[in-house]
Amino acid sequence: MAAAAISHLRRGAPRHARALLYLSTRRFSSSSAAGVAPLAAVAASARRLLSTSVDSGASSTGESYKPPLFDPFRAASLASSAPPLESPPIEELPDDATPPPEEEPGLPAPEKDPVATACQHELEGLKAWVETVRSRKESTEEKEAWSLLGRSVVSYCGTAVGTVAANDPSTANQMLNYDQVFIRDFVPSAIAFLLKGEGDIVKNFLLHTLQLQSWEKTVDCYSPGQGLMPASFKVRSIPLDGNSEAFEEVLDPDFGESAIGRVAPVDSGLWWIILLRAYGKITGDYALQERVDVQTGIRLILNLCLSDGFDMFPTLLVTDGSCMIDRRMGIHGHPLEIQSLFYSALRCAREMVSVNDGSNSLIRAINYRLSALSFHIREYYWVDMKKINEIYRYKTEEYSHDAINKFNIYPEQIPSWLADWIPEKGGYLIGNLQPAHMDFRFFSLGNLWAIISSLATQRQAEGILNLIEAKWEDIIANMPLKICYPALEYEEWRIITGSDPKNTPWSYHNGGSWPTLLWQFTLACIKMGRRDLAQRAIEVAEKRLSEDKWPEYYDTRTGRFIGKQSRLYQTWTIAGYLSSKMLLDCPELASILICEEDLELLEGCACSVNKSARTKCSRRAARSQVLV
């Protein structure tokens, strides 16, 4: 099937594909066996509608996507006659228009489309589970958490648009930027609101942050890419036309020009796309995704991510501090967290991009990148006992097209702690991979989101959860979950962090324990049929969170102390706990965030079109690893 002829999950006829996807969605329950979709044939059809293969007439590069210099959709969304937050006007029929002919009485009613009916049933099922969440009995801790989450809501022009990062009364005079609405911080709050059936605040957030995407942003006279989403925004009141008695509210975004280190938030746009899909799936409001300004926003984000550069790998090249770990921690290059979110955002965008002549090249670029990225991460980032032993025996300085040690990794890079730490059964995706460098630290968010998005294979996903279970005292201990393990210490800490006083060993981003990761751990456990692990982690967190006043993070190797600079009443700690509880009680709702494996995606290798003796694809040699 030619790549240009692919249908994606959009309205009209392609809506059948969306319904097929719904039918193929995993039904979650307490048993892992219940996670298998019953309609395998329908699921396969949906995957075919969602994936591309390269026909023989395509170029070896798959007609690589080139971001347009001028986007007419962009111009339309910014025109004064069509403000970004207004839906396109609906053309009314003229008075003299001929009305449609009435159906003759006695004729049988047209048959209902079974696929569309199934799609509607799926949506009704999700809404029924939302009602179940709303009616469930809440514990004392949950009631307190909802009260605190409600107090954190930020309003703009009379409508709720987000939640502040923290609402700690003890630091009222030293708020820094904790009184702002962060995109990444709001995601667990948005999930909590959606699971509770309160979607308006999420819709407002999506649209207002979309408006901010078009703002001019400069740092020392230099402007980053047009599609960059802000890290955060703040609602400010300013005098109206110099009148000290009249004020108007404005949104003041921060694109990184005020952040510590002046780093652009690479993950903001990725989270925005993931949240947009979740909102549509649980509310059924797909009209939001179809708006011209929203479609333009998606394309601009993808333009930044899919632009050609000097990199030889399908992974995104970013600088230190461009994601949740927003301080210098040695993650510059191709950090796993960004790659997992990137893969998930591409999967979500592929469902939402409108299919037309102007989007064919973009859709091809998405599919090629998904195919290459999944292979790259699964093949080169995965380590278990067998892989570590293989690296231990690597030969170096191999100059050939069929080298085994492709990245010239020196066996001496294997840290001394790893051989004794990694269990016999289990493994994980390493934190980073570059020429002559592997970061063997375990990063929780990247590994968990690799499970959620199906970036990791089924076997790898099981191995990651097996490792967490085997190393419970290291990763969970007294408070879930370690943001990374182990911490940088001694000379390594001084060199890599620059002697950062906030990232001392086993504190903050350097091995601190972050309760907000609980909701992502719960999602991963639900997907893999391991709700028992999520329940254990939630029980550990419940013992302390309310009593400790909902801290941002915990310190020490086992997470016993509240972080030395931790804010209390941290919103994403509160929201992460609430989302975890609701997801665990109604695991069917996890489908709004989870992406199932698409096996046909693995066949979309661009280099299969024009192979030569000089360029050989590594996929055949690694096929068993990828498809497991």
Curated annotation (Swiss-Prot):
Distribution of this protein across tissues and organs: Expressed in roots, leaf and stems.
Gene Ontology terms, MF aspect: endo-alpha-N-acetylgalactosaminidase activity; sucrose alpha-glucosidase activity
Protein's UniProt keywords contain Oxidoreductase: no
Gene3D superfamilies: 1.50.10.10
Stored InterPro entries: 6-hairpin_glycosidase_sf (IPR008928), 6hp_glycosidase-like_sf (IPR012341), Glyco_hydro_100 (IPR024746)
The protein's Enzyme Commission number: 3.2.1.26
Transit peptide location: 1-35
Subcellular location(s) per record: Mitochondrion
Alphabetized UniProt keyword annotations: Carbohydrate metabolism, Glycosidase, Hydrolase, Mitochondrion, Transit peptide
A Pfam family: Glyco_hydro_100
Residue ranges, annotated region (Disordered): 79-113
Record field: compositional bias (Low complexity): 79-90
Catalytic activity: Hydrolysis of terminal non-reducing beta-D-fructofuranoside residues in beta-D-fructofuranosides
Recorded family membership: Belongs to the glycosyl hydrolase 100 family.
Protein name from the UniProt record: Neutral/alkaline invertase 1, mitochondrial
Organism expressing this protein natively: Oryza sativa subsp. japonica (Rice)
